[in-house]
Structures are given as C-alpha cells and as structure tokens.
C-alpha cells in the first residue's frame, strides 16, 4: 500500500527510538501476559475511575532534528553578555577533555547512585578525590561527596549546628550580613520550619546577641571583602557556639583554610571548578566538618574499605545516617545529590593539579588587582581594601555606568547602594579589563595593563598576610600525574570501565526509572546559549530560558492535572520539602497553623518522613493491608484521631508496592474530609503519564522527578530536578526568590534552592523528551513500561513469587520479588542474588525496599524484549544455582552466590571452590562480559574503620 507523505515524514520516529520493544516484541509480550493490546492491558490494571478519557494535550510528536531546531531557535533568544555579577556564580573554562569524556559520555551520566559499590568503583574514586580536594582546601577532617548547592548547604550547616550544639536551650542562628542574599533566603526558609530565630547583623556584633547556638560567616563577603575571622572564631568557640563558614573554592586555593582558623563546618559551591553557570545549575556544593561531628553530617560520604579478598575498595560509608534507613530521624532528606557535577569539579582539580589551580587563582587575583589599581588611579573609590576577585566600586553616576555596561554587553552587579560589583573569573582576559576601564572611566582613560601589572606585582596588599595560605594542597599523586590530555583521557576511561551504566546493560532498579537518556535530549545542555547565562542576569537577556521553562511548565500542568508548576526545587527531596511547605503555609493562611500531622503509609520511601520532619510536621504511620494497599480502616482512624491537627497525607501512586490501589480516590476523600491536603509523591509518574494524573486522581500537590519520568539522567547520583505541581489554592505558597522575581508566580514565600529555577540548564532535556514524544508517545511509554514489568513478573513468578499484585494478578510498572521463602529454605539472601547478578552483567534491582528481604524490579519502557529476556534468563539461572545449594551440591558457605561477584584475577588464581571458574565468571557466556574490579565489600569494616580521603601513595605505585 502506498504511504502518504505524512507517513513518510514520520514525525513520531523518536517514539520508536525511545521505546525498546518494537511492535512485534510488544505483541509477543502481550501474548505472554494474556492481553490483547496495550489499551486492553492498561484497562485491566488501572482503576476505571481514574483513567483519563482523552490524553493530555501536549501536542504531536516531533523528530529529533525538528525538535533540536525548534529548541535552538528558542535558545538563540538568550543574550550572552559577559557577566561580572558574581554572587557565587562565575563563568568557567570546562576542559574539553572532561566535556567530551565525562559530561557527554553515557558511561558517566547514565549510571545510578553507587549503592552497589562493586559496580561503582570508578565514580566512587572520583568522588573520593573530590572529598580530598575539600579536605585540603577547608583544613577540616571529614568531607562529604557533595550537596545540592551552596544555599542548601548553608541550611544543612545550620541544622547540623543545632544537632551537635551543646547549648541545648539556645534557639537562635546568627548570619553575617554579607553572606550572599540567596543563601540567607534559603536559611530563613529552613529555619522557619525548624523553629529557629535567624539574626542578621554585622559579624563583629555577633557577641552582642544571646542564646545563639550557631553562626554563619562568609570568608569572602558577597561584595568581595576578605575577612580574617580567626580571633572572632576563637571567641565564639570559647562560648561553645558552632561556627560555619561559607567559602569560595577558587579563593581557598590562595586563602588560609577556615578549618585552620577554628571553623567547625565549611561549605561552598564547587561551580567554579569547571561547571558552567547554566542559569543557576546544576552545581555541586562541598561540605566539610570536624571529625567529631561526622555522624551528624548530611549527604553522601565515600569511605575506603576492604573487599572479600582483603583488597582496598570504596563504598558509601555510614549510610545509617541517611533518609532511606532513618526516615524522619535522618540527618537530611537528601537522596540524589550532584554526583556528575561533583565529578566534573573533581576531575578539574585532577587535570589542573595544585600548580595549575594556583596559576588560575593567581591570574584571577592579578587581573583584579590591575583593575583595582587602574580605577583607584583615576579617582574611583573601592569599598573594601582586601579582596580576591570581587571589587565593590563606588560610583557617582551609577545609571550612566550601567548604561555603558549594557551597551558593551556587560553585566555588573547593580543591587549595591551607590556602588557596582565586579567579579572576575578564569575566563577574564586583559582585553576584558580594558573594556571594564572604558565602562567605568570612559574611553579616554589612558591606562595600560602592562604598566599596572608591574605596579601591583611588586606591591599587592589586597590579601592580608594572615589570610595567605601557607600549607601545601593536593599533594596526593592523583593530583600530580594526569596533566597531559592523553594521561587524563586514559585516567577517565579507566574509571569509566570500572562502572556499570545504561550504556552496557539494563539497570532494573525499582522506584528509580532508569530509562533512556537520549542523545538528542542531552545535546542542548552544552549549548553556550543555555550554559553561559548567569542566574541573576536581567530577565530580558533570558527570554529563551523563560520561553522554554514556560512551555515545559505548561506541558507538565497538562500531564499532571494541576494548575501551576514551580521549577525551583533542584532534587526530588527538595520538591517534597517545597510541596509540604506549600501545604503548611496554606494552612497558616487560613489560621490553621496548628495542622502539623502528616500521615505516611508504612510502605513509603524514606524521603517522605524525612521531608515531613524538615517541614516541621509530626509523622504518623498508616498501616498497609495484606495486599500492600493502604488500610482504609486505619487511615480513617488515624485521620479522625488527628482531627483538626491533620495537615496532609503523603502517598505514592502507583504505590511503592508496585500496584495501582483501587481506593486511591477514597484515600484522597478521607483526608480532605478531615481538612487535610493530599501530597502525591511523583516517584512513580512513569506509570501515570497519559493514562491518569495526580490532579485527576484528587491530589493537591506533587513533586515530579524529572530525572526519572522525564529523562534527565541520574548522573551516577545526580543531578536531579524536582519541580512541584499544585492546585490553584496552593499556588500562592510555592517557593519564591529574594533576588529574582519569578514571572507568573504570585508568591511571597522564601526560596528552597539557591537559583530561582533550580537546575535550569538541564530542563531542556525534559523539554526535548516531551516535544519528541508528544501526547501519543508519552502514553505509549507508560503503557510499555507497564507491559515490560508484567512480562517480567509473569515469567519469574514461579521461581520468585511476586509479593503484591492488583486486579487479575497484575502489577504496575514494577514488581517486588519475594526472596524471603528462599532465604528460609536455603540461606541464600537477596544480597547474594544481587551480587551474583553482577557476574551475569546486571546491576541489581532495588534491595529490601519497600519490604525487607525482597528485590524490586522496574524495567522501564526503554528496554527491549531481548534485554528483558537476558535479565529473566539470568534470574532463572540464579534460581537454578540456589537449587544446587538447596540440594547440597554446593555448600552454603562456598558457592557462586555467596562468593559473588567474581573478578578477573580469579581466572588465574588458586582455585579451591566446589564450582568451576567458568561457572564463577562466565555464567552467561563470554560475550560482552562486564568485569567488576572488586569482590563483595565488607560494610562492617568500612564503617568501623572510617577513612574518607584518598588512599595511600602505595595504592598508586
């Protein structure tokens, strides 16, 4: 039959690229699960009363090339002025070797958070290097492997200060008046929910205030002044006040370490180490503290441990501090952080080394000295005598200066009374400085760079002698070896080869949605039109961003059934927090601020109770019935018991048990009946899009994990993005921002992230995904995700019972395999199965969540039937191996499962096991074999012998 031109143009071509199984494979799987079609399968599984009659109107699909051209036209509306605004954001030079071999490499950006250390040694090493950078620059004992941004790190420092404070009756937190305004904004937001009073004053007046448990100082103030706080910190410590210091990572290369001055906590943004501004993110924050406070620290900590053979290996240490274990008692609600950006900063430090970093920092400071000398020579006054890279220049004709700057396509900081701020960076050249002279002094200034350079080189006093660093940094071999591009390329490749990412195999992690991150979606994030904008640039310079964000928000509104979307939260956990704050402030606006009880099902993800606690709520757990559903009787009882104090319920849909609960609307009605709000966790939106929606179901607010459902990659543990959708009555209570007015958002609330639109530069990924898929493709993606999960469940249920099912024995987009009966019979655990899967070339499913002793499998729509069958075959082969143990062929203490994973050296080592080397290392054949580089890690050893800096030199010899 002759095809029409429309058919030949095939605007939906990307749908077939994104969805793994082709039409024939889909039909084979439908036959296997006993369904006629995708629509029939969906109709059986999803409750009829929540099925959408028509799909959301987000437009027709577009080809990759058409979507890229459309987005390029939008991006071109952004104006790339040279930015000297500073305030924690500067232009950078990302080394091309890192750009090409990491940021643009799916071997790095498609990996998951390193919960399975045996398949994560590469990025764990890069993260450990970052911790070493942090330790060297801050002068403290313990560092984490990144937080979300500098402002949220400040809020975490405040919370940590209260946890470790010996002044238990003190409830006030002091913030120096020259911290960045966005930092103060986020601190105030967090303090309100914790019930802390925030005092803002000149740092030298801190001792005038009583009942202070913690202090936040900024080493280089927001307008550029370098502070020597040594004496003040000493006095504060004598009064048992916990001292946190915000620091600039590039300035720390030259300045004395705050830890050496007595600071308890030091944090800051790592953006200057090679990560583009990206209109606000994503960027990683560094965070360090004294050793005595290590168990109170937020975020991931990478530690050195041993594997089963006694070899050095790396792992995430002290996980009992974290939300997935301690729930509402966790130190923080952080789940995914900023691993990809952290590793860019880490490798930036490796590539430049101490000599290169000092050269960059000294060049920035020299150019700042030259600029200062020239301006002062011509009669302009600087507000601060001591500075690193930022000048606060007093000007008489401020409007004229700003007009000349705009004409020259330059952005200066303009919010300082009777002055302008100028922050230089590693991209600044002598030509840029001459241009700044012209803007500030006029074209006939008569200044000469070389003459000024000679003057300042011999007589620079802009950094106090006491503030100059006098110790060596980055002495470890890893920072002193890989300085040629060849060496660097090979080092990065050696790290990548140690890890298992989506470019090698399916990652079937339940509740994580490890779907395709298509190349066409990733390409725009490195376009300079998106990468080079400062988050506080004038809005007329960001019209492309505003258009893209507005379109994406409109699509998300239609897909979620909500009335508005706020893009600020820069992780799922931050989205939860922002959504709960909206609920809290809504109740307060109705004089019902006493409503503080949050109902959470027993099956909930650990971030839910941790976020509720952060939002100042009391957590009350609702039971689940034997089928894994919310127990309506218990829900009614708990809601009635809470009464006028009921704030909300946090519920995930489909549930974390992998089923569409039939009574979800009734759950919403019960909570609304008692005056509460419904927070629907968006973690499982991949089983809703195009089929149903949170707003249609009856929820009031949700966060959306754009790094799950909408294709932003996990990056080995971040970046994430967690925008919130809200019904109209909650829209006035979403996060605002103290520096930038967010267009279309009528809110007076404080910020939850440093930048107004969170990690804005990765939003094009989700824009591209929705644009290329269209309404038709998005619905089909959800349907195939459901089909793939049911196909796995149907083929594995005889070997591994599926713990929870819905109507007709179906599951949603994921399924829980119950390992507990096997463990009772044979002694083989879910951990043994997870590690044995590595030998078969797979990342393990989610272990022991939401039920201990289980494996939760989520295949997503992107995996073909071929890959699904490969996984199923591996699981069935493992079941046969378990039967061998059960039959006594292999002893429980010595078999391929308990000894897994096996490494390459075992092929030639002494062999005394009752199974062959071939069974050990080639259970699935030799083709495309993934080799882990370490055996199973000793978690107990790692936590008992905590070591969180680079391993000794001998390991590199």
UniProtKB/Swiss-Prot annotation:
Its cofactor is pyridoxal 5'-phosphate. It is an enzyme of class 1 (oxidoreductase). InterPro entries: GcvP, GDC-P_C, GDC-P_N, GDC_P, PyrdxlP-dep_Trfase, PyrdxlP-dep_Trfase_major, PyrdxlP-dep_Trfase_small. CDD domains: GDC-P. The modification N6-(pyridoxal phosphate)lysine is found at residue 708. Keywords: Oxidoreductase, Pyridoxal phosphate. One of its GO terms (cellular component) is glycine cleavage complex. Transmembrane segments: none annotated. Its EC number is 1.4.4.2. It comes from the Bacteria. It catalyses: N(6)-[(R)-lipoyl]-L-lysyl-[glycine-cleavage complex H protein] + glycine + H(+) = N(6)-[(R)-S(8)-aminomethyldihydrolipoyl]-L-lysyl-[glycine-cleavage complex H protein] + CO2. GO terms for biological process: glycine decarboxylation via glycine cleavage system. One of its GO terms (molecular function) is pyridoxal phosphate binding. The glycine cleavage system catalyzes the degradation of glycine. The P protein binds the alpha-amino group of glycine through its pyridoxal phosphate cofactor; CO(2) is released and the remaining methylamine moiety is then transferred to the lipoamide cofactor of the H protein. Belongs to the GcvP family. The glycine cleavage system is composed of four proteins: P, T, L and H. PANTHER family: GLYCINE DEHYDROGENASE (DECARBOXYLATING), GLYCINE DEHYDROGENASE, DECARBOXYLATING. This is Glycine dehydrogenase (decarboxylating).
């Amino acid at each position: 039959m002759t095809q029409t031109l429309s058919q030949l143009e095939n605007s939906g071509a990307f749908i077939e690229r994104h969805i793994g199984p082709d039409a024939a494979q889909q039909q084979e799987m439908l036959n296997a699960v006993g369904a006629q079609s995708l629509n029939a399968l969906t109709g059986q599984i999803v409750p009829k009363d929540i099925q959408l009659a028509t799909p959301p109107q987000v437009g027709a699909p577009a080809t990759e090339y058409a979507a890229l051209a459309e987005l390029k036209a939008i991006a071109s509306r952004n104006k790339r002025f040279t930015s000297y605004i500073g305030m924690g954001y500067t232009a950078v030079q990302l080394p091309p070797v890192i750009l090409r071999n990491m940021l643009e490499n799916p071997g790095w950006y498609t990996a998951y958070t390193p919960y399975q250390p045996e398949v994560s040694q590469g990025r764990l090493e890069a993260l450990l290097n970052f911790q070493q950078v942090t330790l060297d620059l801050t002068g403290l004992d313990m560092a984490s492997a990144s937080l979300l941004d500098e402002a949220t790190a400040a809020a975490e420092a405040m919370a940590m200060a209260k946890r470790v404070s010996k002044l238990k009756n003190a409830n006030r937190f002091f913030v120096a008046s020259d911290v960045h305004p966005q930092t103060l904004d986020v601190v105030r937001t967090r303090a309100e929910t914790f019930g802390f009073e925030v005092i803002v004053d000149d740092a030298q007046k801190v001792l005038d205030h009583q009942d202070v448990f913690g202090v936040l100082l900024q080493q280089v103030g927001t307008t550029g002044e370098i502070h020597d706080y040594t004496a003040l910190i000493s006095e504060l410590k004598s009064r048992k006040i916990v001292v946190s210091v915000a620091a600039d990572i590039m300035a720390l290369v030259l300045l004395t370490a705050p830890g050496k001055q007595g600071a308890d906590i030091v944090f800051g943004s790592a953006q200057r180490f090679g990560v583009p501004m990206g209109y606000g993110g994503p960027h990683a924050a560094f965070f360090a503290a004294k050793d005595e406070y290590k168990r109170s620290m937020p975020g991931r900590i990478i530690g050195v441990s041993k594997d089963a053979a006694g070899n050095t290996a790396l792992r995430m240490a002290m996980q009992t501090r974290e939300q997935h274990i301690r729930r509402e008692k966790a130190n923080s609600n952080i789940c995914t952080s900023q691993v990809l950006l952290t590793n860019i900063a880490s490798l930036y430090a490796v590539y430049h080394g101490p000599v290169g970093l000092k050269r960059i920092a000294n060049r920035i400071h020299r150019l700042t000295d030259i600029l200062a000398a020239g301006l002062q020579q011509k009669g302009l006054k600087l507000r601060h005598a001591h500075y690193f890279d930022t000048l606060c220049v007093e000007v008489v004709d401020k409007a004229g200066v700003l007009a000349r700057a705009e004409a020259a396509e330059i952005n200066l900081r303009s919010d300082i009374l009777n002055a302008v701020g100028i922050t230089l960076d590693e991209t600044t050249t002598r030509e840029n400085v001459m241009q700044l002279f012209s803007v500030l002094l006029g074209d006939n200034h008569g200044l000469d760079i070389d003459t000024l350079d000679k003057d300042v080189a011999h007589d620079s006093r802009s950094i106090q002698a006491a503030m100059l660093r006098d110790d060596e940094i980055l002495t470890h071999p890893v920072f002193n070896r890989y300085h040629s591009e060849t060496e660097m390329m090979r080092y990065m490749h050696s790290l990548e080869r140690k890890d298992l990412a989506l470019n090698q195999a399916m990652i079937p992690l339940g509740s994580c949605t490890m779907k395709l991150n298509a190349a066409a979606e990733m390409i725009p994030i490195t376009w300079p039109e998106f990468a080079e904008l400062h988050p506080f640039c004038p809005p007329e310079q960001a019209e492309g961003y505003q258009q893209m964000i507005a379109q994406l928000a409109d699509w998300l509104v239609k897909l979620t059934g909500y009335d508005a979307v706020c893009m600020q939260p820069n992780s799922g956990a931050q989205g939860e927090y922002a959504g709960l704050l909206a609920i809290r402030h809504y109740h307060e606006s109705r004089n019902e601020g006493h409503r503080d009880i949050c109902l959470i099902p027993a099956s909930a993800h650990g971030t839910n109770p941790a976020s509720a606690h952060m939002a100042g709520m009391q957590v009350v757990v609702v039971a689940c019935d034997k089928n894994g559903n919310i127990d309506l009787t218990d829900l009614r009882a708990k809601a009635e018991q809470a009464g006028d104090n009921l704030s909300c319920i946090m519920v995930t849909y489909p549930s974390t048990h992998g089923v569409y609960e039939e009574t979800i609307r009734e759950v919403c009605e019960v909570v609304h009946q008692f005056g509460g709000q419904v927070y629907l966790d968006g973690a499982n939106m991949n089983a809703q899009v195009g089929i149903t929606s949170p707003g249609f179901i009856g929820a009031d607010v949700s966060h959306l994990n754009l790094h799950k459902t909408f294709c932003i990659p996990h990056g080995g543990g971040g970046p994430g993005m967690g925008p919130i959708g809200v019904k109209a009555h909650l829209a006035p209570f979403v996060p605002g921002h103290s520096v930038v007015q967010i267009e279309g958002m009528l809110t007076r609330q404080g910020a939850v992230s440093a930048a107004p639109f969170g990690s804005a530069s990765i939003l094009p990924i989700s824009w591209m995904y929705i644009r290329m898929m269209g309404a038709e493709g998005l619905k089909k993606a959800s349907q195939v995700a459901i089909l793939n999960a049911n196909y796995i469940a149907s083929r594995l249920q005889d070997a591994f019972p599926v713990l929870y099912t819905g109507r007709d024995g179906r599951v949603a987009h994921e399924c829980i395999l119950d390992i507990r009966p096997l463990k009772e019979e044979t002694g083989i655990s879910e951990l043994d199965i997870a590690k044995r899967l590595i030998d078969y070339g797979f990342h393990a499913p989610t272990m022991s969540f939401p039920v201990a002793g289980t494996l939760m499998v989520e295949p997503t729509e992107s995996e073909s039937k071929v890959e699904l069958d490969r996984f199923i075959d591996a699981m069935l082969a493992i079941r046969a191996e378990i039967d061998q143990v059960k039959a006594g062929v292999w002893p429980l203490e010595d078999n391929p499962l308990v000894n897994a994973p096996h490494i390459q050296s075992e092929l030639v080592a002494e062999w005394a096991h009752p199974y062959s080397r071939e069974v050990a290392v080639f259970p699935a054949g030799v083709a495309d074999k993934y080799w882990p580089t370490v055996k199973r890690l000793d978690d107990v050893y790692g936590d008992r012998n905590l070591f969180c800096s680079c391993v000794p030199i001998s390991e590199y010899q």
